[in-house]
Amino acid sequence: MNYIHYIIVTVAFLLVGGTNAVAQTDRNWIRQGNRAFKSQKWAAAETQYRKAIYKNQKNPQAIYNLGCALLAQQKDSLAMVQFGNAAQLESNIFRRSKSYHNMGVVMQNHREYAQAIEYYKMALRCNPQDNETRYN
């Protein structure tokens, strides 16, 4: 009787442990999204970044990367929302400047030059050394 009980408990622990090994973290989803993005598989990257955000809604890197994937697919209005969210959540000013820079790029592409300049100024306030933003 004890032997059967021991086997049942052991199998239960193995099953529970196995599901934890399969569970993905938001960082893993971001890495998968980055691989897809580098391969120019924008829709696949978008899916992976959305999975990362589902795991952790407060991850500014996942949100920023989602914005980049959306921008690559020419989904500018959705990308703007993601860049804005990433800028609000990001504590690192250099990464925050990237969000503002990309918002400026979107506005410039839509010929909203005054708005683009404001976003570029915000990016430069965060990172005055960013020559690409200064050039735009």
Residue map of PLM features:
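Short coil turns that delineate tetratricopeptide repeat
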Residues: 57, 91-94, 128
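TPR alpha-solenoid repeat register
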Residues: 62, 96-99, 133
